[in-house]
Amino acid sequence: MLLIPAIDLKGGNCVRLRQGRMEDDTVFSDDPVATAQRWVEAGAKRLHIVDLDGAVQGEPVNAHAIAAICAGFPDLEIQVGGGIRSEEQIETYIQAGVRYVIIGTQAVKAPGFVADATVSFPGHIMVGIDARDGKVATEGWSKLSRHDPIDLAQRFAADGIEAIIYTDISRDGMLSGPNISATVALAQAVPVPVIASGGIANLEQVLALKAHESDGITGAITGRAIYEGTLDFSQARAQAEA
């Protein structure tokens, strides 16, 4: 199972939010490239980068910082989400060196967009499903839809996406532990890999997710835990990927 460090960008800084609240942020660094280097040196094979400003504004805002990370680490797999609403934006990111582009809000608002994107950019499209209280949230998590996460996941899995990133918003940035039962239920319901996100606090929780690798959980994203030191990324990565 791949362990993936998260870099969340807001105003050019690397931050962590609590439960996706833009006003409840902690700044960990003002240098995204140096932050990426830190995780590369710790053995990261992939980075999860979110343009938080982009997610709220509906268009890429921190693309320059993301392009700089791509340029600095051409061999690193980078997956990017936040504010991606058009094929032109997807193309710009891929040309900059991004490996996977994550579609969230637009997947919910315009379901045909995902199918079209997988045709235009085969091998590059992931879908982010962000849930709160059993429903899918959009617009930087500010709006709750009526969609059931599993129903949505099954629909997009049929479109030929590379993976689904499943986030439990109530756990995100809280170090309260991932929602393993909901993540496993979703992974078992779809034939594509699922990457777990939200709530990881320690090594025990990483290994609890790894125990469900056979159910389709192929990766886990960690943010606050590795920045605050409750999880040693290098040690956890070695065990997760063993």
From Swiss-Prot:
Record-listed E.C. numbers: 5.3.1.16
Transmembrane region(s): none
Protein biosynthesis listed as a keyword: no
A Gene Ontology cellular-component term: cytoplasm
Compartments (UniProt record): Cytoplasm
Name of the top EC class for this enzyme: isomerase
Main location: cytoplasm
Known catalytic reactions: 1-(5-phospho-beta-D-ribosyl)-5-[(5-phospho-beta-D-ribosylamino)methylideneamino]imidazole-4-carboxamide = 5-[(5-phospho-1-deoxy-D-ribulos-1-ylimino)methylamino]-1-(5-phospho-beta-D-ribosyl)imidazole-4-carboxamide
Pfam families documented for this protein: His_biosynth (PF00977)
Active site feature: 8, 130
Any one GO MF annotation of this record: 1-(5-phosphoribosyl)-5-[(5-phosphoribosylamino)methylideneamino]imidazole-4-carboxamide isomerase activity
GO biological process terms, semicolon-separated: L-histidine biosynthetic process; L-tryptophan biosynthetic process
Keywords, sorted A to Z: Amino-acid biosynthesis, Cytoplasm, Histidine biosynthesis, Isomerase
SUPFAM superfamilies per record: Ribulose-phoshate binding barrel
InterPro entries named in the record: Aldolase_TIM (IPR013785), His_biosynth (IPR006062), HisA_bact_arch (IPR006063), Isoase_HisA-like (IPR044524), Isoase_HisA-like_bact (IPR023016), RibuloseP-bd_barrel (IPR011060)
The protein's annotated pathway: Amino-acid biosynthesis; L-histidine biosynthesis; L-histidine from 5-phospho-alpha-D-ribose 1-diphosphate: step 4/9
Gene3D superfamilies: Aldolase class I
Similarity field: Belongs to the HisA/HisF family.
Protein name as annotated: 1-(5-phosphoribosyl)-5-[(5-phosphoribosylamino)methylideneamino] imidazole-4-carboxamide isomerase
Taxonomic lineage: Bacteria, Pseudomonadati, Pseudomonadota, Acidithiobacillia, Acidithiobacillales
